[in-house]
Amino acid sequence: FENILLAVKQKRSILKMLFRKFQSNSSESSFVYQTLNQLSLETLGTKVASTLSHGDKRKLELAMALAMGPKILLLDEPFAGLDQAESSKLIELLKSIKKNMPIFLIEHDMQAVFALADKISVLNEGEIIESGSVEKIRRSKLVQNAYLGGDL
């Protein structure tokens, strides 16, 4: 949350925070608006980041990342601290993003991984113990024993 905390500390609105990066380029400013609209965050533009829900802060982090125009989106534990409703909304949002951009997801919430992934690699103590489709990982006794001690 480094960028969001900066906005909170400085009491900047979200739009001011995003536009700070793009002050001189109107096409980039337009892209910021498009990104906010794509993530259904257009109504948050005038709010201060400290007033947002945890889920909206996660969406804002995505907007900030997407505003940079990446070719791939790297997400590290995006579901940490979210309740079930916020997680579900974020899953749907990421499903729409992954249609246009590859996502590399690092996540412990296997249900979120199963909902989003096409291919999965499971690590245990720094080593890949299984790799493959969602179904292969669901059926893997190695993964079940390493993480759940039973069925996924």
Which residue stretches match the model-derived regions?
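Catalytic Walker B motif of ABC-type/P-loop ATPase nucleotide-binding domains
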Residues: 73-77
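A short, surface-exposed alpha-helical micro-motif characterized by mixed small hydrophobic
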Residues: 113-115
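Hydrophobic anchor residue at the start of the ABC signature
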Residues: 62
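Helical segment within the ABC ATPase nucleotide-binding domain
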Residues: 88-99
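Conserved ABC nucleotide-binding domain
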Residues: 15, 35-56
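ABC ATPase "signature
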Residues: 131-132
